[in-house]
Regions:
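Mature-chain termini and adjacent capping regions
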Residues: 1-318
Length: 318
């Protein structure tokens, strides 16, 4: 009876500290004064604000001031948060919920799914995921994969920021990052994606491969790249190199625009002292425009052409 009274006092005194309601349900609840833990078994269900966590087994650690600290859920627990018509679900081997800081940490085969209505819009898998309920910021680490609409990503780390309605506002992919969207694949050290404007930037040894309608590859290497899905355009800067068919071009800055009819990447503009190589010819100029269909290029400003391996032979005296 004494332990039950102590348990109730701990829960209610902690709820007085929180600015939100904390509800703990389970088949059995015991308090260990030696371990400073509340142990929960059977049908465990904890509700904090909009967050609900369910598992078969859990424990709650107690601080020295007898306030509830961290709730740990075992045996593949399940958590969910409902915000308007969006639902965030989290599954993992272990879930840890900081009752003071309102941070949820998922460890081991962690998966988060955000649905709008009945439609999944985001699925994230990682070794570990940490979600701050107050700031709506999620940090994922370890073999992070994400599917967002038509975008598939991989990275060592990801930081996802949601808006007040639960929708995505910003996605950061950090370390060995790769992104695939339709026929385009990109890689680099750091990706930043804005789901609202559908614009993406990538820095650090970047590479993009875009497929044309006839299956040919347009490959872009640079220090920095920016992509707009709405305009289907690319901007690259810093040691830019481009390969297409038998063309190779390089320069300090490039812009790639789509064909007005097909919407596919077709026009490439180099600005600054640039060079284009085709077979045995090098053309160097201040500006170079290259088109892929029909395949052609134009060079302007201090143009120099170098033709390699010209064959010559001595004429015989008549």
């Amino acid at each position: 009876m004494k332990k039950i009274l102590v348990l109730l006092l701990l829960i209610f005194s902690s709820m007085a500290v929180f600015s939100s309601d904390l509800i703990i349900d389970s088949k059995t609840q015991t308090f260990s004064d030696k371990e400073k833990k509340i142990k929960l078994d059977g049908g465990v269900k904890v509700k904090l604000d909009n967050l609900t966590v369910e598992s078969e087994k859990a424990d709650v650690t107690i601080r020295r001031n007898n306030k509830l600290d961290t709730a740990t859920f075992y045996n593949k627990p399940y958590a969910y948060e409902i915000n308007a018509n969006k639902k965030r679900e989290v599954k993992a081997n272990i879930l840890k919920v900081s009752l003071i800081n309102k941070v949820v940490r998922a460890e081991g085969d962690a998966q988060s799914v955000i649905t709008e209505g009945n439609t999944p819009i985001v699925t994230i898998n990682a070794d570990a995921q940490e979600y701050d309920i107050k700031s709506s910021v999620m940090v994922c680490t370890g073999a992070v994969t994400m599917k967002y609409k038509d975008i598939d990503t991989y990275s060592d780390k990801a930081v996802i920021i949601a808006d007040e309605k639960g929708g995505l506002k910003k996605i950061d992919l950090i370390g060995n990052a790769r992104v695939k969207q339709e026929n385009n694949e990109s890689e680099g050290h750091h990706f930043v994606y804005n789901p609202i404007t559908e614009e993406m930037s990538v820095s650090g040894n970047t590479k993009t491969v875009a497929l044309t309608d006839d299956g040919k590859k347009l490959t872009i290497h640079s220090d920095y790249q920016q992509y707009s899905k709405k305009q289907n355009s690319y901007i690259g800067s810093g040691h830019v190199k481009i390969w297409f068919d038998d063309y190779f071009a390089q320069g300090p800055k490039v812009s790639v625009f789509p064909d007005a009819k097909t919407g596919k990447p077709n026009e490439v503009y180099f600005v600054g002292r640039s060079k284009i190589v085709q077979q045995d010819k090098d053309i160097i100029a201040d500006k170079i425009k290259m088109t892929m269909e029909p395949k052609d290029f134009q060079a302007e400003g201090n143009v120099r052409t170098i033709i390699h391996n010209i064959e010559t032979k001595d004429q015989e005296d008549l």
